[in-house]
Amino acid sequence: MLELEQADGSRFFPLRELMVQAGRFVDRLHDTHRQALVGGQTESVLVVGHNAILRALILQLLGLNATGFRRLRMDNASISVLNLSQAEGEPVAVQVESLNNSIHLGNGLPPSKGPRLLLVRHGETDWNREGRFQGQIDIPLNSQGRNQARAASDFLSTVSIQRAYSSTMARPRQTAELILACHLGVPLTTTPGLVEIGHGRWEGCLEEEIAEVWPELLADWKRAPHTVTMPDGENLQQVWDRSLATWHTIVGGLSPEETALVVAHDAVNKTILCALLGLSPADIWMVKQGNGGVSVVDYPQGLEGAPVVTCLNLTGHLGGVLDRTAAGAL
């Protein structure tokens, strides 16, 4: 941790002090808006600050320590959106809707140094719209999903992409193909390591249908998702292991200045982003992934260095700063 010597000879740890300052602010934020948090009321709080304190604030909200400071990036005039809620008797729950969004400035993606990966969630399907658990059922994009993929293609049209990867399933593959329409000659490699979590007997079901047969398991999925193995399906640790192994293989194959497109699914993207942020499988609800949303991961110190989550879940190309994509099941 950074240590400085002050004029009087005493030692000063600026990052440690920032984390303490951010922690006090979070406590005050919770106390000031307790009624809205517990009552489910909608309140929007604008916080304007400097690069370092905003990163410290996000770490505190996510329950992370200062070791994650360099995992985040905050550009000038960027917007990050975090959603807070609290059930009676439970701690405050935090969801990162987006991080370091500067699309409104009209400058495209932030500049990069070193390898870059563009992690995209597939466009919408009919089952997303209906709220059905689709898992490994191979549902294609609907018309809205194709429009989302084309919007992502337009947004990324000026980005130089050298490699592209997707899940073997139709919805991410179709999304990747539409994005690559602006990047002729870039081959698409599909890999089973990026397929969606297997929901087993939940696949094709609406939440209320699952609640009739597996009410306790569904409640656990919402409260403690890392403890659940789907009936005849997968658990998050299995998805975590295969998605991270695939991610590391993709990263390891990049040259120093290459950019790769990776198109996958909600749970897969969440496990990857949680790992990069220093979170665990228990924390996947902390990260939002909208259909057609773009996240950016950089390796500014090279492939052997630590990754930086430069942007998370950018959806401005789909119509606004806030994520208005379907809130359907995985």
Where are these regions (language model features)?
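Short glycine/proline- and acidic residue-enriched helix-loop micro-motifs
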Residues: 1-17, 217-237
